[in-house]
Amino acid sequence: MHIGKIIRQELRNQGRTVTWFAKCLYCDRTNVYKIFQRESVDSELLYRISRILSHDFFKYYSRELEEDEGEEEI
């Protein structure tokens, strides 16, 4: 799972711009592009992003955890 790509896709799905997102995060566009390149994101930042985009990005980690637990039972 690559959370940065998932965040970028959700931003596109909502029709939001990188400039808008950067303003909401109180950072510049360069930092937003760096977030898009990350495979993982600090939980506090992910929480802020989830609130800004009204999208639960933690569910992707929960889903992955459930899949991992299912594999261990086999």
Role assignments for model-derived ranges:
Residues M1-W20:
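A short, Lys/Arg-rich alpha-helix, primarily the initiator
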Residues Q9, G15, K34, Y61-I74:
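Short, charged recognition helix plus adjacent turn
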Residues R12, Q37-R38, R51:
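Residue-level detection of the helix-turn-helix DNA-binding "recognition helix"
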Residues G15-Y33:
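Short alpha-helical DNA-recognition segment
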Residues D28, E39, E64-E67:
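The DNA-recognition helices of helix-turn-helix-type DNA-binding domains
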Residues R38-E44:
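Short, solvent-exposed alpha-helical "recognition" segments
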Residues E44-Y60:
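DNA major-groove recognition helix of helix-turn-helix/homeodomain DNA-binding modules
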